[in-house]
Amino acid sequence: MIFKEEGPLLDKIDRIVDRYVTVIGGNPFLPQFLIGEINRDPEKFVRILQNSGIDPNFLQRVIDKEVEAGNINPIQAADLIPNLIGMIIMPFAARPLFQTIFFQGDREKYDEYLNKRRKMVSAFIKQALTRNPA
């Protein structure tokens, strides 16, 4: 898991976005499948997450350490992860709609958009984590 790798949290954001976009881009129906399976058997996915070593408490400790060092604004892991994953997954899950309304159905242009979006999502999350809240 990327969050357990060495280095600053802000650097990990780039790697997370890149990895998720790459995986989902190669498996475009994965978001719909996972959402369906999570709704069908949520306990199964809790077990899978627990067995895979994903530990929300560890992530919160990483976040808290970065906050204490003055590197990021305070945030809960329960807010960061859904924000990050939602920004990554939604353009894939809603592709038929977004490709039609924003790109007149042009698949190549939408693929370009998805690829460029990697940097935008990383920058957006990093800015939210480091910008002084109003």
Question: What are these model-derived regions, one by one?
Answer:
Residues P8-K12, R47, I72, K109:
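A structural signal for alpha-helical segments
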Residues M1-Q32, A69, A77-L84:
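Hydrophobic alpha-helical connector segments
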Residues K4-G7, N39, E43, E68, ...:
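Short, flexible helix-adjacent loops and helix caps
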Residues G26, N57-A69, N73, M87-A134:
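C-terminal peripheral helix-coil segments that are non-catalytic and often amphipathic
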Residues T22-D64, D79, D106-E112:
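Short secondary-structure transition hinges
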Residues Y20, L34-E37, L84, I88, ...:
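Short alpha-helical scaffolding segments that buttress acidic/His motifs in well-ordered protein cores
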